[in-house]
């Protein structure tokens, strides 16, 4: 079973079956339009904690991954009415990485980049057994070369979904060696035109602005979608006011109290609420921090 490559849809099913689920599947229609387009396919979504970043990634994995059949799930969601719906449904090789999970699982943080490269390589090796992939953890380009080789021999392309991509910069900001090592990995994977030609989409989420870590044009291929400039993603970040009103009607809760406590952002003309706080308030009937 792969750790990162072509995972199943279990996590999204868990979100879908929760007591409260808000359909944000039209986000897929946005990402579908960016697939394979050089100036659009590198997406970095920056937003605060508890604003549904992980749920969105689980949905994108469930939709794109060749490792599952998600048609019965998405047939019932809004994206099913989008003209691009069937074009990409479960037709991509998806590498889905939770950087924070890997980081917290390591006692020795200094080997973070080494283990990340090792785990991705093993997934590639085990899933593409007919291709001779060389492993050299000391070579910063060997992962990119593996992806290029797979593409050149069998024309397979990849989507990267990365959760909390900036965890190393946040947690190890004083460890220059580790941060530089991680930056080099990202540059080798995404900056090179040769490997970029093998990638259909990169959708990564973080907390702090990408420009803070983008030195010497390292990550300048990414378009940042944040709380100041959501670039059309405002309806998919948090719960909208109409969605919260709908929940209050369904669960007979006081919308004005929820608005008082949890109405935190206005993006363009869209009022946004923290999903986790709203769900807890709606289910419990209690309001506060």
PLM features: what roles do these ranges have?
Residues 1-289:
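Phosphate-binding site recognition
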């Amino acid at each position: 079973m792969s750790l990162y490559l072509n995972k199943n849809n279990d996590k999204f099913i868990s979100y879908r079956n929760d007591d409260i689920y808000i359909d944000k599947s039209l986000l897929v229609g946005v990402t579908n339009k960016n697939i394979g387009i050089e100036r659009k396919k590198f997406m970095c979504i920056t937003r605060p904690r508890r604003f549904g970043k992980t749920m969105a990634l689980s949905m994108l994995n469930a939709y794109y991954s060749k490792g599952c059949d998600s048609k019965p799930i998405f047939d019932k969601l809004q994206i099913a009415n989008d003209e691009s719906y069937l074009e990409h449904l479960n037709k991509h090789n998806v590498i889905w990485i939770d950087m924070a999970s890997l980081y917290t699982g390591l006692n020795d943080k200094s080997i973070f980049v080494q283990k990340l490269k090792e785990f991705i390589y093993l997934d590639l090796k085990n899933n593409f057994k007919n291709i001779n992939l060389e492993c050299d953890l000391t070579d910063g380009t060997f992962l990119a070369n593996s992806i290029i080789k797979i593409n050149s021999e069998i024309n397979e392309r990849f989507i990267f979904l990365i959760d909390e991509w900036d965890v190393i910069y946040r947690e190890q900001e004083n460890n220059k060696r580790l941060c530089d090592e991680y930056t080099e990995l990202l540059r080798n994977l995404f900056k090179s035109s040769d490997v970029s030609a093998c990638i259909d989409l990169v959708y990564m989420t973080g907390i702090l602005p990408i420009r803070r870590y983008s030195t010497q044009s390292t990550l300048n291929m990414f378009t940042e979608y944040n709380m100041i400039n959501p670039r059309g993603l405002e309806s998919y970040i948090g719960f909208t006011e109409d969605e919260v009103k709908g929940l209050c009607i369904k669960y007979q809760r006081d919308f004005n109290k929820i608005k008082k406590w949890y109405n935190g952002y206005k993006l363009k003309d869209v009022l946004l609420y923290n999903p986790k706080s709203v769900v807890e308030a709606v289910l419990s009937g209690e309001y506060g921090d």
